[in-house]
């Protein structure tokens, strides 16, 4: 199981940096990794090449993953030591006896960076987007264990209501798999399954489109421990602490510069 977890995280980027980001949220960084600017704790990370984008459902690169890890959070998150799935946006979940139905409880305190409350519908919308044949997301297969997800993604099924995802109520997200999948929770640690903000996606007509302006700093809405502050192409991307993050009290850094 641990080998699979490592492979899943490596698919989404650099494992070591993912750990560094996780630890930076709950601990002070080591000297040399951070700099103080006006009394603020800023972590500086050399991030390699310029980003394709920071849309979690369309990108595939390591540099993108590093930034997305700071800006978004999925239903579950990897434990920094064991790599096992632990609660993220979902505070808890149950699994049916036949191992095919997962029921996630979305935190009442979970919010988007603009203050909007998160709900189960955010995940229904976001998973519909990544499975959209028109979007053509490279990592759509991460959700293929879900009932009828592959058929919808490949265009052989047109009715998304037949896909095994459902908002049972505002804070209850139910997922039905086509067969028992022991590693399903591990798949949910991949950034492609992270939620995107429905109103923002719709405002910029990004449901089936790539490269729209929703990921610009003035438009961006995420749900992670940090929010997008500045993006100077080919120079630097800066994120700052998201005070609307449900667990912001453990975020020791004021920002990260990539």
PLM features: what roles do these ranges have?
Residues 1-42, 56:
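Short, low-complexity disordered leader/linker segments with a strong preference
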Residues 105, 124, 135-202:
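Surface-exposed binding/hinge segments that line
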Residues 66-70, 80, 84, 88, ...:
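Extracytoplasmic/secreted proteins, especially bacterial periplasmic and envelope-associated proteins
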Residues 39-52, 91, 101-104, 123-126, ...:
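Short, well-ordered beta-strand elements
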Residues 76, 80, 98, 111, ...:
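Sec-exported extracytoplasmic/periplasmic mature domains
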Residues 46-97, 221:
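N-terminal lobe/hinge region of extracytoplasmic solute-binding protein
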Residues 91-139, 174:
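Aromatic- and charge-enriched surface segment that lines or borders ligand/interaction sites
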């Amino acid at each position: 199981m641990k080998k699979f977890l490592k492979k899943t995280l490596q698919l989404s980027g650099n494992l070591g940096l993912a750990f560094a980001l996780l630890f930076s949220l709950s601990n002070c960084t080591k000297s040399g990794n951070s700099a103080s600017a006006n009394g603020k704790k800023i972590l500086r990370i050399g991030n390699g090449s310029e980003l394709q984008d920071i849309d979690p459902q369309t990108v595939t690169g390591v540099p993108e993953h590093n930034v997305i890890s700071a800006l978004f959070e999925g239903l579950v998150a990897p434990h920094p030591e064991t790599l096992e799935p632990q609660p993220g946006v979902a505070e808890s979940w149950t699994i049916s006896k036949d191992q095919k139905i997962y029921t996630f409880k979305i935190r009442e305190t979970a919010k988007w960076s603009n203050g909007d409350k998160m709900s189960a519908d955010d995940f229904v919308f976001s998973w519909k987007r990544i499975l959209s044949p028109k979007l053509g997301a490279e990592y759509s297969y991460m959700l293929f264990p879900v009932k009828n997800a592959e058929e919808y993604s490949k265009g052989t099924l047109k009715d998304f209501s037949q896909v095994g995802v459902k908002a049972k109520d505002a804070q209850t997200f139910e997922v039905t798999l086509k067969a028992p999948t022991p590693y399903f929770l591990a798949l949910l640690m991949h950034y492609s399954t992270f939620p995107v903000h429905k109103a923002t996606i719709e405002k910029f007509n990004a449901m089936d489109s790539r490269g729209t302006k929703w990921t610009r700093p003035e438009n961006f809405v995420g749900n992670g421990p940090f929010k997008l502050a500045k993006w100077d192409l080919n120079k630097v991307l800066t994120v700052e602490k998201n005070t609307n993050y449900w667990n912001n009290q453990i975020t020791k850094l004021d920002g990260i510069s990539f």
